[in-house]
Structure formats: structure tokens, C-alpha cells
């Protein structure tokens, strides 16, 4: 067993993401028996001493039958209505499943926007931490009634990676209808299974297939989220929900994504991945080198242009002359104020404007 698999096996704090297809029949009907089986596997892991936070998809699927619909809706309003009805059924089923073990569950509805805002980010973190301290099982889902982008893309994959870092998890386990990563679509034959991803070189030549019609995620979404979590320092296991018990027990199933050696700080993770960028700064070549290679602060002299309506304390993208993002950071000035400082050396500026435009401590290269 590799060191990374062993780290997942022994992790004290685990986030388990469960996709829509893991909770439905092949025809898209919400399947309570599948959820109960997953709860049994998760209970075994918790009984062994791990804290587990569940990120559960399936609200829209769970709302189809109660609303008398014959298939998953395609229009946004009906999706949101189905999510509203289905979320009740979803959480009640989780509550019943864990009630057999005398455990209490708590519902936490989030959107990517919630996590992008620093105050909401902190509140969500505090709530999840307190639920775990009170020995309740947190059931996290995206708030589909308002999160229009999340309904269309991701199936909670990205949210699970954000939650894993939010709660300081030691491991992230992604469970769906795929048993791991392949170098091409396994449904077409001749695909090579990839048991472990240690870095970008292992993904050379990999082509991700499309997702299932029952959910909104796909291999592209799962791969992106796994790499996000791994880059932040969290080991990831991608496995089939049918292998949930084995995956949670540390068996050699699925694909493991090795984490970076040093875990990213909460603030740097928020700047890099969670925060929404409010604008962009275009840098000259010298500033790009200073920011990316030398990890130095960005001075107004190195900025050639800006865009967006941002204020001091907002996160902005830093771009090179080809408009490629090279870093993200927390800007110190409002857009209107910074516009008067572009290209000017620090010595030419008034004393109150001699702070860096973006301090090195608030910069994350991408």
C-alpha cells in the first residue's frame, strides 16, 4: 500500500462526497437502499474513530417522483422546485439511516458564493466545526434553489474540495458511478486504469469522458476537484460508490491523488480557490517575474492596466501581457485609486499610497 493510500486509511477527519448516480437507480429514481448502504459504510469508518462530513448530491433526483415528474427536469425553475422538495426527502433519509446508529444529522446548505465571501466562509467553518464537536453528522449540499451555476455544473465535486479544506480534513473521498481514473473513456474499451496520480506528468495523454445524465458532474469535474484538493494538501480517493465500504476501509480500490507536501494555509487557499475575483491587473514582464518567480509584492509601477470594479480587500487576478492569469491576490486599493498610480514608482507617490498594490503575503501564484 502506498503512503498516500495509507494516509487516507488512517485519516482522522474525512470528507465523503456522494454523487447523484450513487443514490439513484439506472432510471434516475432516488434509491433509499443505496443511501442506507452508504450510511452503513460511513458509520463503520466513524466507529473506527474518524470524523466524517458528508457532501451529498441527489436533491433534484429525490424531488422528481414526489412532484409527479417522469424524468429529470431541464429548465432551471423546475430543477429548483425539484431540489426544494427533494432536499427534504434527502436529509430525512440520511437522518433515518444514521438514526439506526443513534446519530443526529445536521443540514448545511452552501453555495460556492458563500465560501467565496470571507465572512460567510468563516461562519460555515464555525458551524461545521461545532457540529462535529457535538458529534452530529453534517450533511452538506449546494443550495440548488439559488445556486444556478452549481445546478448546471459540478454535482458538488468542487464544493466537496472546498469543504475538505474548510474543515481541515485529512482526506477527501469522491464516490460516484466511476471506479477511478482512466486515460480515456472506459466505456469505449482499451482504456488504461490509473491507480495513483502523483503529479501533472501522470495526466499526460488523459482525456476525460462526459458525465452521467442523472447528475451534472463528469470526469472533468471530478478530476478538477481532486487536483484542487490535492494541490491544497489533501489526499484524494476517487472510487465507485459500490466500493464505498472498501474505499472507507483503506482497501486498494479507486485512484489516489497525492497531495502537495506542504498544506496550503486557509487564507492562501481562500485567495487561490475560494474567493471570487472582482477584477484584474495586467502586469509588465518585470512585475510578472517578481511576483511569480521571486514571490515579491506587486508595486503600482509594474501594473500597466486594470479592469473591474473592485475595492481594497477584494481578490483580483494578476495577468501577464498575454492576458493569462499568473497569480491571484488581495488588492490594497480601490480601482479608482489604483488607476491613478499605474506605472508610477513608489518614490513618486504620496506617503499614504506607498504600500504595495498587492502584498506578497496576500499573493498566490497559479
UniProtKB/Swiss-Prot annotation:
Main localization, broad class: cytoplasm
PUA domain location: 278-356
Residue sites binding substrate per the record: 57, 144, 156
Enzyme Commission number, as recorded: 2.7.2.11
Annotated SMART domains: PUA
Origin: domain of life: Bacteria
Catalyzed reactions: L-glutamate + ATP = L-glutamyl 5-phosphate + ADP
UniProt: ATP binding residues: 17, 176-177, 216-222
Any single GO CC term annotated in Swiss-Prot or TrEMBL for this entry: cytosol
Keyword check for ATP-binding: yes
Enzyme class: transferase
TM region(s), chain numbering: none
Biological or metabolic pathway of the protein: Amino-acid biosynthesis; L-proline biosynthesis; L-glutamate 5-semialdehyde from L-glutamate: step 1/2
Annotated keywords: Amino-acid biosynthesis, ATP-binding, Cytoplasm, Kinase, Nucleotide-binding, Proline biosynthesis, Transferase
CDD domains hit by this protein: AAK_G5K_ProB, PUA_G5K
Subcellular location field: Cytoplasm
One of the protein's GO biological processes: L-proline biosynthetic process
One Pfam family linked to the record: AA_kinase
GO molecular function: ATP binding; glutamate 5-kinase activity; RNA binding
Family the UniProt entry places it in: Belongs to the glutamate 5-kinase family.
Function: Catalyzes the transfer of a phosphate group to glutamate to form L-glutamate 5-phosphate.
PANTHER family, per the entry: GLUTAMATE 5-KINASE, ISOPENTENYL PHOSPHATE KINASE
Record HAMAP family: ProB
Protein name: Glutamate 5-kinase
Organism, as annotated: Mycolicibacterium vanbaalenii (strain DSM 7251 / JCM 13017 / BCRC 16820 / KCTC 9966 / NRRL B-24157 / PYR-1) (Mycobacterium vanbaalenii)
Gene coding for it: proB
Amino acid at each position: 500500500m502506498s503512503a498516500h493510500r495509507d494516509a487516507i486509511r488512517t485519516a482522522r477527519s474525512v470528507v465523503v462526497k456522494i454523487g447523484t448516480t450513487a443514490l439513484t437507480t439506472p432510471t434516475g429514481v432516488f434509491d433509499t437502499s443505496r443511501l442506507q448502504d452508504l450510511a452503513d459504510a460511513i458509520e463503520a469508518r466513524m466507529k473506527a474513530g474518524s470524523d466524517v462530513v458528508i457532501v451529498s448530491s441527489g436533491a433534484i433526483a429525490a424531488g422528481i417522483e414526489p412532484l409527479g415528474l417522469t424524468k429529470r427536469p431541464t429548465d432551471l425553475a423546475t430543477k429548483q422546485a425539484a431540489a426544494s422538495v427533494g432536499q427534504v426527502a434527502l436529509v430525512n433519509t440520511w437522518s433515518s439511516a444514521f438514526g439506526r446508529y443513534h446519530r443526529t444529522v445536521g443540514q448545511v446548505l452552501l453555495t460556492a458564493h458563500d465560501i467565496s465571501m470571507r465572512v460567510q466562509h468563516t461562519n460555515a467553518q464555525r458551524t461545521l466545526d461545532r457540529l462535529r464537536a457535538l458529534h452530529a453528522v453534517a450533511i452538506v449540499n449546494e443550495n440548488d434553489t439559488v445556486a444556478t451555476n452549481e445546478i448546471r455544473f459540478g454535482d458538488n465535486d468542487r464544493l466537496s474540495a472546498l469543504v475538505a479544506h474548510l474543515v481541515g480534513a485529512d482526506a477527501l473521498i469522491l464516490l460516484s458511478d466511476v471506479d477511478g481514473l482512466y486515460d480515456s473513456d472506459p466505456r469505449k474499451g482499451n482504456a488504461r486504469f490509473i491507480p495513483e496520480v502523483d503529479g501533472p506528468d501522470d495526466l499526460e495523454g488523459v482525456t476525460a469522458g462526459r458525465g452521467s445524465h442523472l447528475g451534472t458532474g463528469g470526469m472533468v469535474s471530478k478530476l478538477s476537484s481532486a487536483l484542487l484538493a490535492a494541490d491544497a494538501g489533501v489526499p484524494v480517493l476517487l472510487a465507485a460508490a459500490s466500493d464505498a465500504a472498501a474505499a472507507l476501509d483503506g482497501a486498494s480500490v479507486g485512484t489516489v491523488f497525492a497531495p502537495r507536501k506542504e498544506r496550503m494555509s486557509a487564507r492562501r487557499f481562500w485567495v487561490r480557490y475560494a474567493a471570487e475575483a472582482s477584477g484584474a491587473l495586467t502586469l509588465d514582464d518585470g512585475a510578472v517575474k517578481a511576483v511569480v518567480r521571486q514571490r515579491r509584492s506587486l508595486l503600482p509601477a509594474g501594473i500597466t492596466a486594470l479592469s473591474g470594479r473592485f475595492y481594497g480587500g477584494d481578490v483580483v487576478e494578476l495577468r501577464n501581457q498575454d492576458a493569462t492569469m499568473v497569480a491571484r491576490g488581495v488588492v490594497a486599493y480601490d480601482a479608482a485609486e489604483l488607476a491613478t498610480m499605474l506605472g508610477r514608482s513608489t518614490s513618486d507617490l504620496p506617503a499614504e499610497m506607498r504600500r504595495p498594490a498587492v502584498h506578497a503575503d496576500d499573493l498566490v501564484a497559479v
